[in-house]
């Protein structure tokens, strides 16, 4: 038989999905917009709205990709594989991490297809890293030490760039 063009595991429904094309023909393009006060919305902001944010990065204190201490990568007791789905609340209150959240969703949202983060940024440094994560946020009453073995992070990407003085 013919193999699917793309096969994905949908964590919310705990099912495998098989697609004849990628992105799936049935996928609807939706945009999420940064809004004031850390809000994220499917509604496009007004043209004259000032939806920018800023932070100061300290290269001597980089943002960790997982909570400290970090165990050995492989071997007995290694938690290397599940770090992809670890709770990210440990960095939420850092002054060099920006976060936006939607209001609680009133219906299920499935994210499938090509995901693009469009950022407009400037830096006073000679290089910068911007990391964008799309995360399903747990309610505050969920403990921080839950384990989601077998689930995969839906989006995690890193783009590095070197800037020169002619770019702002």
Identify the residue ranges that each predicted region occupies.
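C-terminal, loop-rich substrate-recognition/catalytic regions characterized by aromatic stacking residues
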Residues: 1-162
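Single conserved hydrophobic/aromatic residue that forms the stacking wall/gate
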Residues: 163-168
